Regions:
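Structured C-terminal helix/loop/strand segments within mature extracytoplasmic catalytic/sensor domains
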Residues: 197-249
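Short, surface-exposed loop or secondary-structure junction motifs
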Residues: 1-192
Length: 249
């Protein structure tokens, strides 16, 4: 069986309370990704590459992604509330629940990653599963805004930050792991700005031109994914625009 209500030798991966998935699921997921066709040479939003990035990093450093990011970034940045699998570190009262999952786990997802694929990877994934708060994320985005430096410590080379936060291909609004502006206005985010939005209702944005860091955290999937008014009404983007209009002359 793929799933078990109890943890045993064959079912060690916990996807939520009282549900464990077979250990071989990770190899199955990677095999499916390896076998997937490349398709046409056009832009397509996909998480598949980030599954592979995680596997590559863990192989190179000999540590899981959670341990690696804690040691390389989060602890020295003072991001003490940022982690994968937060139930292992914090009480449930300190963790916000997300969706009542009717298609996979059949319960309120609380303390576990919302993304089903990341859940199958044990909650530590390259594309989803990171829990944090606004203060920690402000530190991370400020480090990016500083060109990879924070608190007199260098985490990334300036050219690395510049490469990942620039528009990668003509005709789309993506950097490497970051969003870019599709269009810009006189009063609003600059072309140099970059950030990221999350499915559960989050947004981080940094603008080197105006020295602005914007953090928006919401819980729009609690308790259901639809209707997605947050995206339809562009709440995150509209609040960001109000900030620019209040600051810029």
């Amino acid at each position: 069986d793929f799933y078990s209500r109890k943890q045993d030798d064959e079912h060690q991966i916990k996807v939520t309370d009282n549900i464990y998935i077979i250990n071989s699921i990770k190899d199955t997921i990677y095999e499916d990704i390896y076998k997937s066709s490349l398709g046409s040479k056009s832009y397509e939003y996909s998480d598949l590459g980030y599954y592979i990035f995680k596997k590559k990093l863990e192989k190179d450093f000999g540590k899981d992604l959670n341990q690696l990011t804690q040691e390389k970034f989060y602890q020295s940045l003072g991001m003490y509330r940022t982690t994968f699998n937060p139930k292992e570190k914090f009480s449930l009262e300190d963790i916000i629940p997300t969706e009542y999952d009717k298609t996979y786990r059949n319960q309120l997802v609380h303390g576990f990653v919302h993304d089903q694929g990341a859940a199958m990877m044990g909650g530590i994934a390259g594309h989803a599963g990171l829990f944090s708060n606004s203060i920690d994320l402000a530190k991370l985005m400020q480090m990016y805004l500083n060109g990879g430096e924070y608190g007199d410590e260098v985490y990334l080379k300036p050219e690395t930050v510049a490469e990942f936060t620039k528009q990668q291909f003509k005709g789309n609004h993506r950097g490497a792991g970051f969003d870019k502006m599709q269009t810009t206005s006189k009063i609003g985010p600059s072309a140099e700005s970059f950030g990221h939005t999350g499915f559960t209702g989050t947004m981080v944005w940094a603008d080197p031109k105006y020295n602005i860091v914007y953090i928006f955290l919401s819980n729009r999937v609690n308790e259901t994914v639809e209707p997605n008014y947050l995206s339809v009404k562009k709440v995150r983007e509209n609040i960001r625009q109000v900030i620019y209009e209040a600051i810029l002359p």
